[in-house]
């Protein structure tokens, strides 16, 4: 909506869009992960600037491809987006640069993960699929049985496909979860107002995680 208020912008096109956005932008029926058709559409429409926000196309390198075609973008390239698309990478990055984070261990073998759970015997414990899972790849186990079930769901049953090829088993931390975002051009950082993502499906912060609201 803020883009629409800018007098220098002639038209806003959103793909794939939805009923709410349709009031402010022209919506086209192209999947966000259909990079080839998305880039082709942007070229044909002579798009001057592209804002790429969903996790999947960022991880797949949409910004890289568009910029190679001469279309400037707002959004990280694939090398930067891996901070969001791989929890293992993000945790190891924080460890490398001594950024405070919950204690964790990484596993690519289900039985090794189960052995670790039984050795630690600490609950609640948090299990996370390494890759993108629409905000649903984080499971909080209250018991050993739930933790083992979560490992099998993520790694054996592959509930989230390749996203669960590796998992992170993480220390459970209590307290309000806050999202702090910022804009940067690589030199200057401008923070936005902090917010809270209400991820649980039920009231009183109960139920499974969702994509968030």
Language-model regions, residue ranges each:
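Conserved ATP-binding module of the ATP-grasp superfamily
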Residues: 100-103, 122-127, 141-179
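ATP-binding N-terminal substructure of ATP-dependent carboxylate-amine bond-forming enzymes
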Residues: 1-78
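Short, charged, surface-exposed secondary-structure boundary motifs
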Residues: 23-24, 39, 82-88, 202-204
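Short acidic-hydrophobic, aromatic-tinged amphipathic segments that line or gate anion-handling sites
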Residues: 27-34, 105-109, 141
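A conserved helix-loop-beta module that forms one wall/lid of the active-site cleft
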Residues: 75-137
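Short beta-strand-to-turn element immediately C-terminal to the catalytic PLP-Schiff-base lysine
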Residues: 107, 138-143, 182-185, 192-193
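Phosphate-binding core of ATP-grasp and ATP-grasp-like enzymes
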Residues: 154-155, 173-213
């Amino acid at each position: 909506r803020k883009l629409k208020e800018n007098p220098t912008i002639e038209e806003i096109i959103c793909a794939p869009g939805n009923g709410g956005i349709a009031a402010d932008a022209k919506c086209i029926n192209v999947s966000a992960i259909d990079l080839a058709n998305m880039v082709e559409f942007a070229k044909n429409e002579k798009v001057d600037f592209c804002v790429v926000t969903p996790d999947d196309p960022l991880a797949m390198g949409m910004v890289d491809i568009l910029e190679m075609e001469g279309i400037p973008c707002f959004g990280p390239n694939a090398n930067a987006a891996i901070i969001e698309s791989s929890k293992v990478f993000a945790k190891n990055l924080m460890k490398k640069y001594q950024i405070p984070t919950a204690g964790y261990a990484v596993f690519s073998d289900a039985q090794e993960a189960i052995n670790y759970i039984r050795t630690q015997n600490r609950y609640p414990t948090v299990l996370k699929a390494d890759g993108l899972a629409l905000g649903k790849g984080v499971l909080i186990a209250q018991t050993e049985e739930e933790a083992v079930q979560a490992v099998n769901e993520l790694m054996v049953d592959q509930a989230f496909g390749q996203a669960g090829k590796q998992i992170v088993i993480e220390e459970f931390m209590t307290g309000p979860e806050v999202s702090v975002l910022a804009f940067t051009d690589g030199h200057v950082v401008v923070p936005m107002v902090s917010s809270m993502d209400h991820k649980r499906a039920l009231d009183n912060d109960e139920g499974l995680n969702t994509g968030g609201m």
